[in-house]
Amino acid sequence: MSDVSYREITAKGLWSNNPALVQLLGLCPLLAVSSSVVNALGLGIATLLVLVISNSFVSLIRRQVSDAVRLPAFVMIIASAVTCTELLMKAFTYELYQILGLFIPLIVTNCAVLGRADAFASKNKLIPSAVDGFMMGLGFMLVLVAVGAVRELLGTGHLFGDMHLIFGEGARSWQLNIFGADYPNVIFALLPPGAFIVVGMLIAAKNSIDAHLKKRADARKTAVSTGSKRVRTTGAVS
C-alpha cells in the first residue's frame, strides 16, 4: 500500500471513522469503565493489543479460511488474543485487572474488533492490517482516556489518580489536584448517566469541527471555481 493509503488508515482510525465517536461501537465498556484515566487507559491498551493481534492473524489466514466458517474463525482468533492480553494483565497489572474485571473478557464481543477483522484485515495484507488495528485501537483508547479524564476531574477534582496500577510505585506522585481539597465532588459525573453526557458532548464537538472544516473546504472550492471563470477583456466594447 502507498503512503497515502497509510495516511488514510490513520485518519480513519483517529478521526473520520473513529470506533467510539463515529461508529459508536464498544459503548458498554466506554460508559462503564471510563470513570478515571487509569481505568480508561488500562482498557484502551488492552483493546489496542487485541485489535493489533487479531487483525494480524486474520490477515495471515485470510486465504485459508472459507466464507462458511469465516466469522467463527475470527471470533476464535479474537478470543485467543483477549486471553493472552488477560494473562498479561494478571501478570503485570493484577490490581487494575481486578478493577476492570469482566470488561476485559468482554472485549471478545466488542463489535469494533470483529468489524475490523471482517471489513479490513480479511481483505488486506499483514502490515496494513496491523496498522489499521493499531490506529483503530488508538482512536478508541484516546476517546476512553478523554472521557475518563473529564469524569475523574469533575467527580473527584483531580487527575491521574492511581496511575501506579499501570506504571508502578513511582507514578503515585503523578496525581494532579486541580480543584483543591474543598472541591465538592460531582458524583453524577462518575455514574453511567454522566458518562453518556460526556460522550455526547465529545460527539457533538467532533461533529461541530467536521461541519466547520467542511464549510471552509466548500468556501475554498467556491472561490477557486469563481476565479477560474473570470475572463479578462481589453479594448472598447461597442
Swiss-Prot record:
GO cellular component: plasma membrane
Topological relation to the membrane, as annotated: Multi-pass membrane protein
Subcellular location: Cell inner membrane
The enzyme's E.C. designation: 7.-.-.-
Pfam family for this entry, one: Rnf-Nqr
Keywords recorded for this protein, A-Z: Cell inner membrane, Cell membrane, Electron transport, Membrane, Translocase, Transmembrane, Transmembrane helix, Transport
Principal subcellular localisation of the protein: membrane
Residue ranges of the TM segments: 20-40, 41-61, 72-92, 95-115, 130-150, 185-205
DNA repair as UniProt keyword: no
Tree of life domain: Bacteria
Broad class of enzyme this protein falls into: translocase
GO BP terms in the entry: electron transport chain
Reported function: Part of a membrane-bound complex that couples electron transfer with translocation of ions across the membrane.
PANTHER family cross-referenced by the UniProt entry: ELECTRON TRANSPORT COMPLEX PROTEIN RNFE, ION-TRANSLOCATING OXIDOREDUCTASE COMPLEX SUBUNIT E
Protein name: Ion-translocating oxidoreductase complex subunit E
Species of origin: Cellvibrio japonicus (strain Ueda107) (Pseudomonas fluorescens subsp. cellulosa)
Gene encoding the protein: rnfE
